[in-house]
UniProtKB/Swiss-Prot annotation:
Annotated segments matching region Interaction with KCNE3: 238-246
Residue ranges annotated as Cytoplasmic topological domain: 1-120, 177-192, 243-260, 349-669
Protein name: Potassium voltage-gated channel subfamily KQT member 1
TM segment ranges: 121-142, 154-176, 193-218, 227-242, 261-283, 323-348
Top-level taxon in the UniProt lineage: Eukaryota
Assembly and oligomerization: Tetramer. Heterotetramer with KCNE1; targets to the membrane raft. Interacts (via C-terminus) with CALM; forms a heterooctameric structure (with 4:4 KCNQ1:CALM stoichiometry) in a calcium-independent manner. Interacts with AKAP9; targets protein kinase A (PKA) catalytic and regulatory subunits and protein phosphatase 1 (PP1) to the KCNQ1-KCNE1 complex, allowing PKA-mediated phosphorylation and increase of delayed rectifier potassium channel activity.
Region (Interaction with CALM): 370-382, 515-529
Stretches for region Interaction with AKAP9: 588-616
Region (Interaction with KCNE1 C-terminus): 535-572
One Pfam family linked to the record: Ion_trans
Binding residues annotated for a 1,2-diacyl-sn-glycero-3-phospho-(1D-myo-inositol-4,5-bisphosphate), in chain numbering: Q244
Post-translational modifications reported in the UniProt record: Phosphorylation at Ser-27 by PKA; increases delayed rectifier potassium channel activity of the KCNQ1-KCNE1 complex through a macromolecular complex that includes PKA, PP1, and the targeting protein AKAP9.
Gene this protein is translated from: Kcnq1
Region of interest (C-terminal assembly domain (tetramerization)), residue spans: 589-620
Length: 669
């Protein structure tokens, strides 16, 4: 292949190599199947752009990247496909053009922005729409006042045009973005989305506004009396603010929870209303007021008076005239008004309980990530003792295949591209974008000095020159001789670190460091979980203490039951009959009773043995007919007393008393 060939010729040559190895799809397929590939290189013999071969590591025919391009020599077939050389990540062919966002991704973002607003941007947008709708409603009200009709009508006309265009466009965009969800895909899915109540309201508002603008004459809104009835449709725009219906769901949940109390109070209040109104009608149906007119001429008038009274409005158009009617009305007011006021208190307490429940739910939701982090860190601490390779794979950076362009003066890219590339690398290594608490660091190691790469990397050369400024600051040989030691220290400090790409490259100090980091992360997660578990209200503290007290009492009862089962009941309050029954059991009390019985029997036998030994001693000393009392008297007269004669009956003799023969008084003298 000619080194000065044009890019089309080079492309045809690449296609030829691809056909030799198999069918290909794009440059990526060729890179996987061909043992070497061609890259763009500037600064050729003609000053134009040529294609330079990039061969795998160790392949023959590889030249330095900045040298003139040479003809490629195919690598041996047994080497197989290998990743190409990474020259400069700033000029990757994937970053030369903007990444194309998928259609479903754009639909999802638009749908979340319009239908699921979160964040300050969504808040600003929807709040601005609410203000515009409110201003339009105010001008619609002012257009009915003769004093402001001229100003409000003209302004309202142009505001209606803007709002119709805006809401119509937004309706179409909402209908289009709903396709990101599976149940709204296709025509039937869009129709299902359009059948939602809030979508029907939006469509009615847009159509009603278009009818008002089209039928109006001389540029004035609501010019004819036939269109005045459509004005109330403008109020439906206020429903546009709460598209999710959170307000109505909250009200419905409160009413549903307290439905029994509400039904009871309303039922009793309604009964009090109809009975009291009927009694007032009977008392006031013939009464005439000062103007000579009967105020309670029908039962409907009495019901109207009752409704106005129990709702504490009191228009004063109907007033009882007789004392009987006034008495009935006073009793009715005290009784019925209290029942009609109860629903307000019930709903208020229900809303307060609902808010408290949501706060507790939020407080509980904060514990979920903390608990998950604690479980994760605890498991990682446990897995660190396992020598399996999967434990350490998260710390190994996968070798990313980079496709680069050769350029003598590459332009630095924006930081956005760097962030996107970093995000892609993290995603390839199994990291989720939301994992911000415990980031897994990638481990680097010093490359061995005796290992030399088979290729020349411009990126490594540029980084080494950039990170070693002392090589560029050398002025005289004398400076080199006097500062050789300092230069060696600088070069040692500027050693390039290579990322670890395989588990086998991890050493013992790497694993020990990982274990220490995991243990520190475990303690941090434990502390955060304990902080998240702290109660935020006094009621929660009381509830927690009561629950703990209940658990403590249950454990104490269980311990007492086990003690009674093992030791037995206290013998102080047990009668003898129950003790005899308990002797056959295996409790500690029964065993102690049996041991005490055995000790008593042994004591009795030892007493018998002691008496027998005394008799033997007496036989050895003075004969069988010697009396102890006479021996005591005789011994007392001689001035010596034999101590063996005063041994207690329940005491045992010593070993010397049993073995050493006693000497008489004559022998002792």
């Amino acid at each position: 292949m000619d080194t000065a060939s044009s890019p089309p010729n080079a492309e045809r040559k690449r296609a030829g190599w691809g056909r030799l190895l198999g069918a290909r799809r794009g440059s990526a397929g060729l890179a996987k199947k061909c043992p070497f590939s061609l890259e763009l290189a500037e600064g050729g013999p003609t000053g134009g752009t040529v294609y330079a071969p990039i061969a795998p590591t160790g392949a023959p025919g590889l030249a330095p990247p900045m040298s003139p391009p040479v003809s490629p020599v195919p690598a041996p077939a047994d080497l197989g496909p290998r990743p190409r050389v990474s020259l400069d990540p700033r000029v990757s062919i994937y970053s030369t053009r903007r990444p194309l966002l998928a259609r479903t991704h754009i639909q999802g973002r638009v749908y979340n922005f319009l239908e699921r607003p979160t964040g300050w941007k969504c808040f600003v947008y929807h709040f601005t729409v609410f203000l515009i709708v409110l201003v339009c409603l105010i001008f619609s009200v002012l257009s009915t006042i003769e004093q402001y009709a001229a100003l409000a009508t003209g302004t309202l006309f142009w505001m209606e045009i803007v709002l119709v265009v805006f809401f119509g466009t937004e309706y179409v965009v909402r209908l289009w973005s709903a396709g990101c969800r599976s149940k709204y895909v296709g025509i039937w899915g869009r129709l299902r989305f359009a059948r939602k109540p809030i979508s029907i309201i939006d469509l009615i508002v847009v159509v009603a506004s278009m009818v008002v603008l089209c039928v109006g004459s001389k540029g004035q809104v609501f010019a004819t009396s036939a269109i005045r009835g459509i004005r109330f449709l403008q109020i439906l725009r206020m429903l546009h603010v709460d598209r999710q219906g959170g307000t109505w769901r909250l009200l419905g949940s409160v009413v549903f929870i307290h439905r029994q109390e509400l039904i009871t109070t309303l039922y009793i209040g309604f009964l009090g209303l109809i009975f009291s109104s009927y009694f007032v009608y009977l008392a006031e149906k013939d009464a005439v007021n000062e103007s000579g007119r009967i105020e309670f001429g029908s039962y409907a008038d009495a019901l109207w008076w009752g409704v106005v009274t129990v709702t504490t409005i009191g228009y004063g158009d109907k007033v009882p005239q007789t004392w009987v009617g006034k008495t009935i009305a006073s009793c009715f007011s005290v009784f019925a008004i209290s029942f009609f006021a109860l629903p307000a208190g019930i709903l208020g307490s229900g809303f307060a309980l609902k808010v408290q429940q949501k706060q507790r739910q939020k407080h509980f939701n904060r514990q979920i990530p903390a608990a998950a982090s604690l479980i994760q860190t605890a498991w990682r601490c446990y897995a660190a003792e396992n020598p399996d390779s999967s434990t350490w794979k998260i710390y190994v950076r996968k070798p990313a295949r980079s496709h680069t362009l050769l350029s003598p003066s590459p332009k630095p890219k924006k930081s956005v591209m760097v962030k996107k590339k970093k995000f892609k690398l993290d995603k390839d290594n199994g990291l989720s974008p939301g994992e911000k608490i415990f980031n897994v660091p990638h481990i680097t190691c010093d490359p061995p000095e005796d290992r030399r790469p088979d290729h020349f990397s411009i990126d490594g050369y540029d980084s080494s020159v950039r990170k070693s400024p002392t090589l560029l600051e050398v002025s005289t040989p004398h400076f080199l001789r006097t500062n050789s030691f300092a230069e060696d220290l600088d070069l040692e400090g500027e050693t390039l670190l290579t990322p670890i790409t395989h588990v086998s490259q991890l050493r013992d100090h790497h694993r020990a460091t990982i274990k220490v980091i995991r243990r520190m992360q475990y303690f941090v997660a434990k502390k955060k979980f304990q902080q998240a578990r702290k109660p935020y209200d006094v009621r929660d503290v009381i509830e927690q203490y009561s629950q703990g007290h209940l658990n403590l009492m249950v454990r104490i009862k269980e311990l007492q039951r086990r003690l009674d089962q093992s030791i037995g009941k206290p013998s102080l309050f047990i009668p003898i009959s129950e003790k005899s029954k308990d002797r056959g059991s295996n409790t500690i009390g029964a065993r102690l009773n049996r041991v005490e019985d055995k000790v008593t029997q042994l004591d009795q036998r030892l007493v018998i043995i002691t008496d027998m030994l005394h008799q033997l001693l007496s036989l050895q000393q003075g004969g069988p007919t010697c009396n102890n009392r006479s021996q005591v008297v005789a011994s007392d007269e001689r001035g010596s007393i034999n101590p063996e004669l005063f041994l207690p009956s329940n005491s045992l003799p010593t070993y010397e008393q049993l073995t050493v023969p006693q000497t008489g008084p004559d022998e002792g003298s």
